[in-house]
């Protein structure tokens, strides 16, 4: 790719050793082979309960971006980065997404943009992060999810049991 940075794609996207990464949406087949991931990086193609250090979402329709934004944000680590990738105008792929649209949606979600990158000759990306002053407020995302509690067995005593027995007696 003439004219593109010689910086490895994983480094350009901020992927470091040991990171949890989610790659979602219309992922081009050439994307992952070009990543050259550092050691210990775990890649997922669907959102799981744990927080992700880097999420890369490929979209070509505004409706899809709006639909996926909330669940993706809920899984982003407070210090992590969310890359939204859309087709460049030069790619001549139909899309209703632009850099300005992505930025406005990010700002509405409490994020700020801090990096733009050419992912390849078709896709451009904008990195969004949680505002520094808000990271403490969303720090709960970094905690592993609480284990699901088993329902307590029903008992014949306790609050409401006396009323239930009184109502069920024959008159």
Predicted regions and their residues:
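Short, charged/polar "capping" segments at the starts of alpha-helices
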Residues: 28-34, 92-94
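Conserved class I S-adenosyl-L-methionine
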Residues: 13-27
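Conserved Class I S-adenosyl-L-methionine
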Residues: 96-117
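A short glycine-rich, Lys/Arg-flanked "PGG" loop and its adjoining helix->strand segment in the class I
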Residues: 66-78
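Flexible, glycine-/basic-rich loop-and-beta segments that form/coincide
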Residues: 9, 131-171
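Short beta-alpha junction loops
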Residues: 86-91, 121
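Conserved beta-strand signature within the Rossmann-like core of class I S-adenosyl-L-methionine
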Residues: 76-88
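Short acidic low-complexity segments
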Residues: 41-52
């Amino acid at each position: 790719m003439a004219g593109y940075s010689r910086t490895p794609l994983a480094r350009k996207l901020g992927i470091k050793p040991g990171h949890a990464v989610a790659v979602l949406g219309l992922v081009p087949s050439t994307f992952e082979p070009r990543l050259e991931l550092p050691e210990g990086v775990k890649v997922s193609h669907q959102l799981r309960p744990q927080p992700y250090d880097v999420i890369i979402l490929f979209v070509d329709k505004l409706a899809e971006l709006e639909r996926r934004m909330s669940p993706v944000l809920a899984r982003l680590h407070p210090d992590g980065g969310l890359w939204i990738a859309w087709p460049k105008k030069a790619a001549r792929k139909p899309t209703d997404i632009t850099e300005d649209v992505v930025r406005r949606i990010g700002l509405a979600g409490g994020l700020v943009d801090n990096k733009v990158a050419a992912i390849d000759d078709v896709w451009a990306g904008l990195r969004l992060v949680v505002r520094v002053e808000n990271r403490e407020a969303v720090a709960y995302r970094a905690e592993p999810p609480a284990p699901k509690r088993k329902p307590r067995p029903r008992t014949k005593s306790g609050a409401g049991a006396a009323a239930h027995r009184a109502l069920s007696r024959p008159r």
